């Protein structure tokens, strides 16, 4: 199984820091932010990893990561020429992934607990998608998963709703079969003109082809100054950046 890290975007919410570097290279704990999703994939046994990023800072990311020998993995790099949404960036992984199932992590997502058990469950899943949820105090900032009465199935995902139907949010770790690329080709751009990953996930929801897990450990994205500080506190509190099981 292969892994994809999406590390594009211009990081407007972290300006002016992102005027000089890609946000995924900012320090979180004792390492650059992108090291955490890399370690997550490796902890799940995934060592063939594609990194998708924008053209402005591609050179910095390649210089930092190299071919992957420092991590005992293999890196491939692709450029997203312009911001077109998470699903647009994901579409660039089609040739890399081929006909296999794969795992996607957003490069600003920081977790303290290994995703290995969830990836192992996905390996046994015959088809479809698997997404990870976390219960949070302010779900309206994220994509919110509405669950059925028995909490067995996701019935809808709403992006940043004013009145969330639950406090379970979809974190930036997604597992897909190769059908996802056909789905991306057929989704309609959002009002901001981007291909949204929520539209992709809702296709799987509507077709009863998605399972979910509620993650253990702590999680945050690091895309704002507040959440970047939270991510640093989170990793320094465990006194290391090694993903644990």
Predicted regions: what is each one?
Residues 119, 123, 153-245:
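Catalytic-core segments of class I nucleotidyltransferases/pyrophosphorylases
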Residues 67-72, 147-148, 203-205:
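Short, conserved catalytic or adaptor-binding loops enriched in Gly and charged residues
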Residues 137, 145-153:
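Ligand/cofactor pocket segment of small-molecule handling proteins
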Residues 19-24:
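Short alpha-helical oligomerization interface
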Residues 2-5, 13, 27, 31-106, ...:
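Conserved N-terminal catalytic core of the sugar/cofactor nucleotidyltransferase
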Residues 131-133, 144-146, 173-175, 219:
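Conserved hydrophobic/aromatic beta-strand scaffold that supports enzyme active sites
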Residues 25, 145-147, 212:
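A structural signal for short hydrophobic beta-strand segments in well-ordered beta-sheet cores
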Residues 113-141:
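Conserved donor-nucleotide/metal-binding helix-loop-beta segment in metal-dependent transferases, i.e.
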